[in-house]
Amino acid sequence: MKKMSREAFILGQRREELNMTQKQIAAEIGISLQQYQRFEYGYRDVSAASAKLVLRICAALELDPYELIFENGIDLAGKNTQE
């Protein structure tokens, strides 16, 4: 069994916080349910997706793209925020 990635965990947790189904998120993003599930189950890395798709995912889930992609986030100077 594949270990859940940090990104996948964040997606699932945030979706549940918003009380939305995977199908609702997929529809809002404009992708199929199966495509979204690949991200949330960790079979596809969000960071490997196009920037446009990452931004749509983050908008639907009300997430900061930097917090999703970069483990420690980044500040405006481009440095890790937890250094």
State where each predicted segment sits.
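Short, basic-rich loop-to-helix N-cap that marks the start of a DNA-contacting helix
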Residues: 19, 43-59
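Short alpha-helical DNA-recognition segment
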Residues: 19-41
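Alpha-helical residues within the helix-turn-helix
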Residues: 16, 27, 59
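Short, charged recognition helix plus adjacent turn
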Residues: 59, 67-83
